[in-house]
Design a protein with these regions (language model features):
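Active-site-adjacent helix-turn-beta-strand microarchitecture at beta-sheet edges
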Residues: 127-215
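Conserved, well-ordered active-site substructure
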Residues: 135-154, 161, 208-272, 276-308
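Extracytoplasmic
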Residues: 87-89, 119-121, 191, 218-220, ...
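A short, polar/proline- and glycine-enriched secondary-structure boundary/capping micro-motif
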Residues: 111-115, 178-183, 242-251
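Bacterial Sec-dependent signal peptides at the C-terminal "C-region" and cleavage site
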Residues: 3, 10-27
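Zymogen propeptides
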Residues: 19-158, 166-169
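Conserved hydrophobic/aromatic beta-strand scaffold that supports enzyme active sites
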Residues: 89-93, 195, 222, 301
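Short, solvent-exposed aromatic-acidic interface loops
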Residues: 105-111, 174-177, 235-241
Length: 308
């Protein structure tokens, strides 16, 4: 027998599939306003090749809520094309000066084992990196020790956490500068792909010239760093009243997710494993967890706690 939640998810998936794929028309992203109208903030035919600052009009539509010290979070209803016609963006901003970060490794019985149910008292927790079979892809450093060697790919990025609490972003797959310091200055590190923004908010050419699949839609989870040094998180969820249907892996394209991160002020950004892996927990100001669950367990998570 199929459970109620699973049945609901299947029903939504079949409905979206029946709508058919979206072609390469001039796609857009807009905020869905309470009035029923929408406010456009991105169009593919006019997409910036570089985001030098946040979109102040878009930021003005976001109501930020306090989480634990150092964390703000928000949700924003948006509309894209096709199956992305009704999505919710889940957003978070973290001040590393008020946080401590750790990676959680979870392989049990040769299988991934982490979900946000293990987040405990974390101020924020989410799946980290990209996953290949049962393991994270690429470089993983935990507690100053290298757990996995670096991966190589032109569209990869890395987040490095230093022993003094600072965060360093690495564009590209060359982590040699930091790898040699893994048992000293580096407390944790992980890689992921594809890169969404690099340098000073530049959209990689591969996201603009057709080198990647620009039409594929999926539930997305992205991580970035803004010019104030804050860590940015953005997740897409299907906006549906059907219980559990928000976890259906429909959402934005990779170029659209780059636009989301750029519009919210990211200077650097990368995707994390999305689809059925994407999951996020945020503890509000009184310690109650806001949870966006995934559909499968993962081997690696980034966990942030208030204080050092």
């Amino acid at each position: 027998m199929i459970g109620r939640t699973a049945g609901s998810i299947i029903a939504v998936a079949l409905f979206a599939a029946a709508a058919g794929p979206v072609g390469h028309e001039d796609t857009t992203l807009a905020v869905r306003l309470p009035s029923g109208e929408s406010r456009l903030f991105w169009r593919a035919s006019r997409a910036p090749v570089q985001w030098t600052a946040a979109d102040v009009r878009l930021i003005g539509l976001v109501t930020w809520h306090p989480g634990q010290p150092g964390v703000e979070w928000a949700t924003l209803p948006i509309a894209g094309h096709g199956e992305a016609h009704a999505l919710t963006l889940v957003l978070a901003r973290l001040d590393p000066r008020a946080m401590s970060f750790d990676l959680a490794w979870a392989i049990e019985g040769d299988r991934p084992a982490w979900t946000i149910d293990r987040a405990g008292d974390a101020a924020l927790a989410l799946n980290a990196g990209m996953f290949v079979e049962r393991l994270p892809w690429g470089w993983v450093v935990m507690n100053g020790r290298e757990r996995l060697p670096p991966g190589h790919g032109p569209l990869s990025s890395a987040l490095v956490g230093l022993a003094d609490g600072r965060l360093v972003w690495v564009d590209g797959d060359d982590v040699s500068t930091w790898r040699g310091r893994a048992e000293g200055d580096v407390r944790f590190a992980f890689q992921s792909y594809p890169t969404l923004l690099a340098g000073d908010g530049e959209v990689p050419a591969a996201l603009r010239d057709g080198s990647i699949n620009e039409a594929h839609r999926d539930a997305r989870l992205a991580l970035g760093l803004d010019r104030q040094g804050r860590l940015l998180v953005a997740m897409t969820r299907l906006d549906s009243p059907i219980p559990g249907a928000d976890r259906v892996p429909f959402g934005l394209t990779v170029p659209e997710m780059a636009a989301v991160m750029g519009a919210f002020g990211a200077q650097h950004a990368m995707l994390l494993d999305g689809g059925i892996s994407a999951q996020l927990a945020i503890s509000d100001s009184v310690g109650h967890a806001k949870e966006w669950k995934g559909l499968r367990k993962v081997p690696l998570a980034l966990v942030a706690r208030a204080g050092h």
